[in-house]
Amino acid sequence: MENLIIYAFIYLLSSIPFGLILAKFFAKTDIKKEGSKSIGATNVLRVVKEKNPKLAKKLAIATIILDFAKAAIPLLTLKFLHYDQALLWSVAVLAILGHCFSIYLLFEGGKGIATGAGAMIVLLPLEVLTAFIVWVVIGKIFKISSLASLAALLAFVVSSFIFNYDLEIHTHAPVFIIAFIIVYKHLPNIKRLIFKEECKVI
């Protein structure tokens, strides 16, 4: 019963669309109706930037921090309380599911990068650092958020086998589930990348 309460809490918490809330409250803009219609930091930056560039950067950074924290803080708390690895990985997957398929948005949502990073920084920090370096490098070179994110995801999955070939839960299934969710949410971006139609962020 305790585990079910934890799972429900994590899903409801991670479902909170911080990017949407921040853009509506501070910029009076509905990002679900503009840009890529995603609730993530990239769309916050892209949409709000048209009206207020300085505010756009602040809101995008705040969105990243909050989306990251809504997974990282609960997982850090549970880890501190010595909950087992199986529960921690279940919580990580649910956090990403909640963000990507928010109950408050009729199961629509973001693309899972910041929330995924927040979850994985607790469980696989070295892999997240590797992914972050790849994200920065690809982002600097191509200035395409989705390409940088997908490259970082690939780096994360590959490095998870290099640095943690035998996870404590004895399976990489949660890593693949998380990767699948994120790739699924990026399918429109992948299509635009193939046809060279994806927009640059900067």
Curated annotation (Swiss-Prot):
Pfam families given in the database record: G3P_acyltransf
Compartments, as annotated in UniProt: Cell inner membrane
Keywords from the named record: Cell inner membrane, Cell membrane, Lipid biosynthesis, Lipid metabolism, Membrane, Phospholipid biosynthesis, Phospholipid metabolism, Transferase, Transmembrane, Transmembrane helix
Membrane topology per record: Multi-pass membrane protein
Transmembrane segments: 3-23, 87-107, 118-138, 144-164, 167-187
Subunit structure, as described in the record: Probably interacts with PlsX.
Family: Belongs to the PlsY family.
Protein name: Glycerol-3-phosphate acyltransferase
Organism: Campylobacter jejuni (strain RM1221)
